[in-house]
Amino acid sequence: MAPLLRPADFPASARRHLDDAKLLEANSRLPNAGHLYGYAAECGLKALLIWHGHPTDAEGSPVHALGFRQHVDQLVITSTFKALKRFVNNRSGAKYLAMIPSISAFSDWKVGHRYFSETALPATLPRWKAAAYEVGRMLDQARMDGKK
């Protein structure tokens, strides 16, 4: 019997969401671009965790038990991000965390924004974009370092 493939591919998902966000922004679809910048960052953080040994479920997603199976706004809140930093730093991940200094920009990103009117969305797209680009560069570096 062939081994089961894990469908979750956080590095590829992060790149796909980042690329799609760029296309949406270029076509003045700013609310959806902002939403995808958040998903790109979330996937990048989860890739970082998994590369550094975080346990995964059968699909390849972070297990619930350690508190990291959340959306980006919850991953960057102080208590959760401190735990994330401790986990990754204890496994030689400080270099990658240093590459995403603006990740806290997603503290006002919400998965529920997809239901909001455009006028009710926060005006933080430029900050989300900058932070998502940092995550993209971090993923590029990790790939050059042999992370998959």
Where does each model-flagged region fall?
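Terminal alpha-helical segments
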Residues: 1-148
